[in-house]
Amino acid sequence: MPVRQLPETIVNRIAAGEVVERPASVVKELVENAIDAGASRIDIFSDGGGRRKIVIADDGSGMTQADLALAVDRHATSKLDDEDLLQIRTLGFRGEALPSIGAVARLSITTRHAAEPHAWALRVEGGDKTPIAPAALTQGTRVEVADLFFATPARLKFLKTDRTEAEAIREVVRRLAMARPDVAFTLAGEERAPVTWAAALPGAPGQLIRLGDILGADFRANAIEVRAEREGVVVEGFAAAPSLTKANALGQYLFVNGRPVRDKLILGAVRAAYSDYLPRDRHPVVALFVTLDAREVDANVHPAKTEVRFRNSGLVRALIVHALKDGLAREGRRTAANSASSVISTFRPASMPPANWDWRSSPSYPVGGSAAPSFAERAQAAFDVGAPSADIRPQEVTPDLLDRPLGAARTQIHETYIVSQTRDGLIVIDQHAAHERIVYERLKASLEANGVQRQILLIPDIVEMDEATVERLVARAEELAQFGLVIESFGPGAVAVRETPSLLGKTDASGLLRDLAEHMAEWDEALPLERRLMHVAATMACHGSVRAGRVLKPEEMNALLREMEATPNSGQCNHGRPTYVELTLADIEKLFGRR
């Protein structure tokens, strides 16, 4: 077959396959056009998941008759000058959206420019244009797309259900609405109740209101403002406290110069910043906005413009990590404070016995000569001095302790949790999780300073393991030594532990080594040295912290609270779990129906 030039209609349909993948792609392109036109309000309607109908109406600048005629031609755009490809400041710039949509659907455009006496309308069906005609419209542009992919029926087979396509449209609009809180959005359709996001005030407060409207009240309550700037690059936005996570990375919203993107570099930076706070199977919720010179970022990488490429990717990554870490450290003790409020509603008053209940029939009531102990006897046994339980006698509380962030320790329950009293309520602290974070931060600080101090064992601990595990540990001996753990091979199936970190005190060397070996088996060889060292520190901290089941004296409990107050990131342990939960007096009153 000889080489020949394809007809314009076929060329447009091929191009449409790159730009218009599904109904959500149409919505994205048209809403971006509305934003570029300076709209302050955008209304979106869809039917049949966008297959049957999509309508986008805005109050933007609109188009003149001449501009409308050109708008449906390929590569005709008002957003790009001859030599301006490296300084793109608009969401759209290729001039492909409208002709691509018109090539595969029935496209109707009605628009009015302020300089025109009335509106103009144009129709494109499968690439065939009708003449422009006068129409009625007050301001802006109204675009209707009907029978999507009628000209390319094969594409219809690859679409999902109406519900799935409608949800994809919703997600696209959510991301664009987050990027532009100054624009009001309304999303309606046959598949959903109308949703309206009112235009918010400029600045961070307005941005948080919009994010809270879209991501929910939990995000707003747990949001931490972050910001960093260097060499003309600005990173700002909001990150959720580590107590609010998801099972996947779908809760991470990233924007570059106002453009929603999915960028592996930024996602990796977010993961790195939260590495000290979250377990591996949990993901943070963030909304980050990166602003930089348009010449420093290439938005022309992907046909759908969902990917970007940075000229100085190292700077962008470092700035994101710095902004997030700084914000999380600054709000370290607040990160767990909201945990209690989210579960208050799950509490129910204890069930009361029925009115006709006979207390004498209770199994605990002594019948005849039963030797069942009385309540007083059982209570006395519970407080027996010789019993392995904490001393829970009320402790004297001074006013100054009540004013401390974590209050004054009052008691220990189940040899695991410390209950402290504050001026506004009470706090329950997980003693192991709290001390684990303290030890972890100490190890990191020692490593960054003069190295971790060691204690020499008079008699080395010999730990027997299989040969593969021994080889794995010995291969990392130099890294372990940086944390004060000095080991060496002791034959084919054993390791000798000669020194341990002083911070850990008397520790179970065998258990520590076995845990380290298990974690090392999961490491990717490409994992940076810094991340490997932090994994080692986390494992050591877990072994060197106060265990659940250990009885603490009142002075020990208070000392732990004071250390928590002085320790960065003390709201979570190294595995991402909260170290404490706060119940305010208002929360307690809700439990008892006083509020």
Swiss-Prot record:
Ranges in coiled-coil conformation: none
Record GO cellular component, one term: mismatch repair complex
SMART domains: DNA_mis_repair (SM01340), MutL_C (SM00853)
Presence of the UniProt keyword Lipid biosynthesis in the record: no
Any Gene Ontology biological process: mismatch repair
A Pfam entry, by short name: HATPase_c_3
Assigned keywords, A-Z: DNA damage, DNA repair
Keyword Signal: no
Superkingdom as given in the UniProt entry: Bacteria
Gene Ontology molecular function terms on file: ATP binding; ATP hydrolysis activity; ATP-dependent DNA damage sensor activity; mismatched DNA binding
Protein's job: This protein is involved in the repair of mismatches in DNA. It is required for dam-dependent methyl-directed DNA mismatch repair. May act as a 'molecular matchmaker', a protein that promotes the formation of a stable complex between two or more DNA-binding proteins in an ATP-dependent manner without itself being part of a final effector complex.
Family: Belongs to the DNA mismatch repair MutL/HexB family.
Protein name per UniProt: DNA mismatch repair protein MutL
Organism whose genome encodes this protein: Rhodopseudomonas palustris (strain ATCC BAA-98 / CGA009)
